[in-house]
Each structure stands twice: as C-alpha cells, then as structure tokens.
Design a protein with these regions (language model features):
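Core alpha/beta catalytic barrel or barrel-like domain that forms the active/cofactor pocket
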Residues: 180-205, 226-242, 304-306
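Intrinsic-disorder/low-complexity accessory segments
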Residues: 20-122, 126-137, 141-147, 201, ...
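Short, solvent-exposed turn/loop segments enriched in Gly/Ser/Thr/Pro and often Arg
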Residues: 151-155, 166, 229-236, 670
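Aromatic- and acidic-residue-enriched segments that line the glycan-binding/catalytic groove
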Residues: 160-177
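Substrate-binding/catalytic cleft of secreted carbohydrate-active enzymes
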Residues: 176, 192, 259, 279-280
Length: 825
C-alpha cells in the first residue's frame, strides 16, 4: 500500500509537466530532424518550455545580434534550486574569490551547454530543444544537484543564413547525392556571423556583439563544465573528449582526468547504440579563444563535441562508406552526449565544486606581474578588454621594474608611472592572465589546430615587462578633460592610434579639410611626427561655425588638439609647404564574394563599419568587369584566390586605373594575383635547394615530418621604415603575426616599409627551422609605385580576427596617406 501511494505521488508530480509540456515534434507539428527549425521558432519553443515549467526553467535574454535576433539562455534545475538561483550563483562566485562572501559547501554543479556557434553546423540547435525536453521529462533526479544552462544558438544570424538557404534550395524529399545543390552552400556560407567572423575564435578577443554579450553572462555564472557543440566532415563520425595534445600547462591534472571520465561515460552510450566515435585526436586545448579553451582557462571542464555533418549534410547525405547520415542521426548523437555529460556532473557535483575552487587559488607562476606602457588610447583599449573578462588591474607607483622585456626578448627594465598598467597573476583569474600575457606559451606538441602565439603586449603594441615579483599597484580614477578650442590659425592632432583615425574619419565625413605632414613639423618647440593631422581655418572657410564644429567632433572623440597661431613653423616645413598635404576623400571599393576569403572580407567590412565608421562600397567579384573605376580611388582586396576574377581584360582595366592614380591594397592571399606580372614588382621567396634530399619519410610520420616547414601563427620582429607614409604612427620596429610560410622577396623598385632582416627567430609561437631560414630578407609590408598610382602589399594580415590591434594603423595609413600626391574633390 505504501509503495502504491509513493508511485501515485510520483505520478502526480510528473503529470502536470507531461500534460503541459510539449515535445519539440508536438510543438512544431513535424518530427524533429525532418526539417531545419528557424531561430524565431527555436525561441518560441524555449518560451513554451519556460512558461510550462515556471518553477524549473528561467529564460534570460542576454542580447541581440547585428540582425536583431535574440540571444538567450535557459537555466534549468529543480524547483528548490531555481527558488535559490541567485544565492547559488553568488555562492559559486564567492567560493572562487570573484565576489566577497563566505565559502559554502554542497553547492549544485553548474553545466553550460553551448550550441551552434557555427551557423551551418545546424544539428546542435535542434538537439538543444530535445535536450531540455528530456531533462525535464526524464532526468529530474539529476536536476536536484545540477544546474544546466542551455544556450540554444550562439550564432543565430549565421544559422538562419544557412537554414533559409537550405529551405529554399532543398528537394522534397531530400536528395542524398552530394552532387545535389542542397549540399553545396554559396559564398559566404552559414558558418560565420553577420560580419562573417568565426565566433569560435572570438571568445578571448570579444570583437563581436554575440561574444561581448555572452561572456558577460558567462562570467556572471562561471560554470564548472562547458560543452561547445560542433559538426565536422561527413566521413568523421563523432568526436568527444578527452582532447588531443597540446594542452596548455595551466590545465590541471583534475581537468585532464575528468575529461577522460566524461569521455568514458559518453562512450558507454555510444557503444550501446553501436555508434562510431573518436577521442584524443585533432582538437587540442591551447589557443585561448575557443569555446573549449576559454572555459578551461576559467576553471571549467571545457570540451568540444563534433558530430559528422556540417553544412554539406543537409537533411540526409551518403558518406564515402555509402551510409546515409541524417539530421535525425546528428541531433540524436548530440542529445545523447549532452545528457551523458549532465549525468557526470550530477554524479560528481561535490568534487566538481571542490576542484573548481582550487583552480582559482593563487599559483606560484614565474611571472607574477605584467607591466605595460603605451599611449592612453592603447592602455584604455586593453583595460576595456580586461573588464569584459573580469580581470583586475591597476596603476604602479613611480619605480624601476626589471624583468623580461618584450621589445628585446631579453632581461631589461622600465621606469613606471601612474599612466602605466599592472596586471597581476595574484587574483582569482590569474590563470587567464598568464595565458593572455605570457611572452611565449609552452608548447608540448608543435602539431596544433590553430595559432601558437597571441601575447597581448605584442598584439596591442605595448612595451611590457614580465616581472618575477608582484608589483604593488593601485586604482586610478581618471577622466580626461578636453580643453575647449579657442579661435586660432589652425590645430594639430598627433597620429598614434586607431582613435586618431576615427577622429579623421569623422572630420572627413563632416567635409572638414585635413592636412598631414610627411616630415616632422615643429611648432612652438613641439615636434609633431609625420602623419599628424593639421586642420586650418583657412582650408575650411565654407564652414561658418568652424571652430565650434571642430570642437564638437574633438570632444566626441576625446582628442586634445594643439592650437597653432601661425603657419610659420620653428623650422621648415611651414604649414603651406608641399610636404604638408591635403588628405584625399577616400572612395573605397571593397571586394567580396567568390574568390575572396569570407573571413578576411568580414574583418575588413566590420573594421570599416563598426570601428573606423567610414563608408565603403562592397563590390561582388561577379560584377568586377562592370565596375566604373572612376568612382573610386582605393580598392581593398581581402585575402583570397583571384585567378577567375582577374582575367586578362579585368587585369588590363585594373592596371589602367592604377596607372591613373588608383591605389590597390592587397592583403595576404590577394597578393598572389600580382606575382605573375613583373610590372607589379612582386616575387615569391622560395626555399633554395642546394642538394636534393631523398624522400624517405614513413607514411605514419608524413604530417610530423613537415613541421620544420610550418609557421603556426608565430610572432616575429620586423624592421620598419617609419619615414614612409604607410608606417606613420609607428617606430622603427613592429611585431607581426605570421600565419604561414608564404614569403615575398624584398621589392627591387618599390618601398620595403616593414621587413624581416637576417638572423630572425620567433619571439613567440612555433616556426619550423626550415621555415625560419626562408624568412630572412622578406617583405612584410610594402608599396610598389605604378604610374601615378600604387599597389600596397600587406603580406601578414594586420586585421586577423580583429584582435591584432597594433596592425590596424597600417591599413589606415594605406588608405589615407600613401601616394597622396594630388588632392581630388
């Protein structure tokens, strides 16, 4: 009788959920996996789940995409836990020292499941809906000591781009032949977001709105386990943890070992179903900006799960083994691994909390403080990034600090001031500080999935010291007061940073004429280096209220202009000198479409629209031959393969335009298009083979044998000709991020503005011995005059993932300053 009563109580407890909560298939009216679900429908389903289970599910809308789609998470747990959600969250942060408060025990485990960061890996969002349904209807016991956070789609814009294309293109019933059009996405594909960024490389750099809003809520929760759901090629069945080497050295033994336990539990369910899978291959834990590494460096068990499929798979496709891979298969596998991971959290909640807290204890790292010096704009930009990640920083006292000096790669010292920045590893997020700031991350295996160098001082163009002692620092509350402009002959703004370029962009769009100096300018004993912006009243007489208009723009962009009372300088040049030139209004064409790298195009598109705030005309390569080139004076070519674009006729028209004064800015792979014509002055530098070496490498060792030819995202020092307009705002050296082993000879008849000299070595990251030899005497950035115009070569992409902040001024200089020989209205 007692057992019957108990069963009745349990049944009554479940009945309200079963009566109200619909499965995804019931809600949509079609079997889940028989169609792709659009994002608004996914949001509708999660709202249905939350309204049906108000005591167990809470939705949080944490932002909107560029195309105004909702970004959201669902927090799922037991009724008791949901009642105490805020105290549980705060206890978790207090236990790791992020917030004040007593440390507590018996806290629930927190699992965060992230789906569909790559839009065309579309099965995982479908799986997210089935996962939340099964958690609530079948796994209530797990929720008693586990909080599950589900983000059903990290990239709604990219996913809907894919889903809408597929729904418009696919046959009914679907066609499993890979030759069918439904298995071949058009450019740019659904993988990236609106601005064509790979959001799974953006976690640490937070350049995109999706990332910025997500990491805010992520750091508010700080989960113990994080799973990033992906898809891979149709012939690669399923990958789950444990990860492959290299592991970053800060990853603890517990993090390594528990990945194995999770993997074994996943394997148990896959084995029961006879599903294929692999582990410990390909996907490592090193580069910090992934959806597995960022959480790992924030203390979690961070993992990538990869299902066969990707954008090619559609609703069903035959793989190379003749097996049909369906969307139902794909979402079922992801649902299974996600639930198996939650199960492991439920079984190990106490240990997860305990080890998670240990991760945030102070570590005895070699370098305990990083001291950074640079312009206020650069320091402020870095502060903004650190604040997004919840990393603490301060200002030092006026002292001399000795340690590893980034600019020389040797021991050195700097004298600090309150305008400098100190970031210490003695803080809860000290592990992430080490990862982001250390000069050269220790690499256990040179075969990696991504770049091997990213050190923030190099990326941000800051002088830095890594000190072995902790440097005392304090908080500085500063607010820069911009002196209002008074009437003067003219005004000067020094040229050092992207913020100066934003100011210039605003001036030009306000039709204010601006000059720049090609030689040092001395006024009232102050030297203004080349590239300084000179705005005179005489050039802008058409503006009736010129001073107030200029002051308004200067205040908006926080620029303190220096007034000049006369055009007569201390020494030449004077303001009216031919060496002080009016800046042309750039009329920029930016190529997109087939042949261009969507990622490279996206970096440029985002830069012009969201950072520089300067309008460009985007031209699809299919329309290249119809372009009226007289409408433009600058052509920006993203990295890509332009063989089918630059046909003989198209190349002839491009040459004619350049010779009449046009500028081409060719980035990375775009430079290939100019290597087959001697008039462009560009030649590859290839390895000189003095003696033919027989190929005796075994089949098994082929990949590893090629590592001596590889450069996997390493940082090198270049020599810079700072007198050239392309390098205005830089000193005599620049640290470049090399992404591969393609090299170009020094220009014979042009200008080698940044180049790698002899006896080079990487300051950070991996480069094979043979690849290093071939780097000597190679051009990184250069200008090749061509008639009245020129070609500007940027062989290392300064816009890469928009995180290499110190390279952006080269692109800006190419547009505004290089070959600015005649002013055009």
């Amino acid at each position: 009788m007692r057992l019957l009563s108990l069963l009745l109580i349990v049944a009554l407890g479940i009945l309200p959920i079963q009566a109200q909560l619909k499965s995804p298939s019931q809600f949509f009216g079609y079997e889940l996996g028989s169609e792709f679900t659009r994002h608004y429908e996914v949001v509708d389903y999660f709202e249905h789940v939350a309204s049906s289970n108000k005591n167990q599910v809470k939705l949080e809308y944490y932002g909107k995409t560029n195309e105004r789609r909702d970004l959201m998470i669902a927090v799922i747990s037991s009724e008791e836990n949901v009642k105490n959600l805020e105290s549980i969250r705060n206890n978790n942060l207090a236990n790791i020292g992020i917030t004040d408060g007593d440390k507590t025990k018996n806290n629930p485990a927190i699992v965060w499941l992230s789906y569909n960061v790559h839009g065309n890996e579309a099965s995982s969002t479908e799986a997210s809906m089935l996962t939340i349904y099964k958690l609530l209807t079948e796994k209530q016991e797990w929720l008693k000591n586990t909080i599950v956070i589900i983000d059903p789609c990290l990239n709604p814009d990219g996913r809907d781009r894919y889903v809408n294309w597929f729904n418009e293109t696919a046959s009914k019933p679907y066609n499993t032949s890979r030759q069918a059009s439904e298995h071949s996405e058009p450019w740019p594909g659904g993988r990236p977001n609106h601005y064509l960024f790979d959001l799974n490389r953006d976690w640490a750099w937070a350049t995109q709105i999706e990332t910025q809003t997500r990491i805010k809520v992520y750091n508010k929760w700080m989960p113990h386990i994080h799973v990033d759901f992906h898809e891979q090629g149709i012939n690669e069945p399923y990958y789950f943890a444990p990860a492959a080497e290299p592991f970053h050295e800060i990853i603890t033994d517990w993090q390594r070992d528990f990945q194995i336990e999770i993997g074994k539990n996943n394997a148990k369910y896959f084995d029961e179903n006879g599903w294929l899978y692999f582990t410990r291959e390909r996907f490592d834990l090193f580069y910090p900006s992934y959806g597995d590494t960022y959480p790992t460096y924030m203390g979690a068990i961070g993992m990538t799960y990869e299902q066969a499929g990707h954008g090619m798979a559609g609703l069903g496709i035959l793989n190379d083994e003749g097996v049909e891979l369906t969307l139902v298969d794909r979402l079922t596998h992801h649902t299974t691994s996600g639930l198996a991971t939650v199960e492991m959290a439920h079984k190990n909640a106490e240990k997860l909390n305990e080890e998670f807290a240990k991760f945030f204890n102070n570590k005895n790292f070699k370098y305990k403080s990083y001291i950074l010096q640079g312009s206020k704009d650069k320091i402020d930009r870095l502060k903004s990034l650190l604040l997004q990640h919840g990393i603490k920083f301060g200002s030092p006292k006026n002292i001399k600090v000795t340690g590893y000096k980034y600019s020389t790669g040797t021991q050195g010292s700097i004298n600090t001031s309150a305008s400098d920045l100190v970031v210490s590893t003695n803080q809860p997020k000290g592990n992430m500080v080490k990862v982001l700031f250390e000069p050269n991350a220790k690499l256990s295996d040179s075969l990696t999935y991504d770049i091997t160098a990213w050190s923030i001082p190099y990326a941000h163009g800051l002088e830095a010291i890594a000190a072995t002692q902790e440097i005392e620092h304090f908080e500085v509350l500063e607010r820069l007061y911009i002196e209002p402009l008074k009437d003067a002959y003219g005004y000067i703004n020094k040229w050092n940073d992207l913020e100066d370029a934003k100011f210039l962009s605003a001036l030009l769009q306000a039709n204010i004429r601006v000059r720049f100096n090609e030689k040092p300018l001395i006024q009232k004993g102050i030297t203004y280096q080349p590239g300084s912006l000179i705005i005179t009243k005489g050039d802008n007489q058409k503006h009736k209220d010129f001073v107030n208009k200029l002051d308004s723009i200067a205040q908006e962009y926080r620029r303190q202009l220096s007034p000049i009372s006369s055009g007569f300088s201390d020494v030449t040049p004077d303001i009216g000198s031919p060496d002080i030139k009016l800046i042309n209004q750039p009329k920029i064409a930016l190529l997109s479409g087939d042949g261009t790298s969507s990622l490279s195009f996206g970096e440029l598109w985002h830069f012009f629209e969201k950072q520089l705030n300067f309008q460009v005309t985007v031209i699809h390569t299919n329309h290249f031959r119809n372009v009226n080139w007289s409408d433009f004076n600058v052509l920006v070519m993203p990295s890509g393969y332009y063989g089918s674009v630059l046909t003989e006729d198209n190349l002839k028209s491009l040459k004619d335009w350049i010779s009449k004064g046009g500028k081409v800015v060719a980035i990375d792979g775009a430079m290939r298009a100019f290597t087959n014509d001697d008039s462009f002055g560009l030649q590859y530098k290839t390895k000189e083979e003095t003696e033919k070496t027989p190929n005796l490498t075994t089949y098994a060792n082929q990949e590893r044998a090629n590592t001596n030819q590889m450069i996997t995202g390493a940082i090198f020092k270049t020599t810079v000709d700072a007198t050239h307009p392309l390098a205005f705002g830089y000193g005599d050296q620049y640290f470049t991020l090399k992404l591969g082993n393609t090299n170009y000879k020094l220009l014979d008849s042009g200008y080698n503005v940044a180049y790698i000299d002899n006896n080079t070595k990487p300051f950070s990251g991996f480069a094979g011995s043979e690849a290093i030899k071939n780097l000597n005497q190679t051009m990184i950035f250069g200008e090749q005059p061509y008639g009245r115009g020129s070609l500007i070569y940027l062989s290392d992409n300064p816009m890469f993932r928009s995180f290499w902040e110190n390279g952006k001024l080269f692109l800006i200089n190419a547009i505004f300053f290089v070959n600015n020989n005649s002013f055009t209205l």
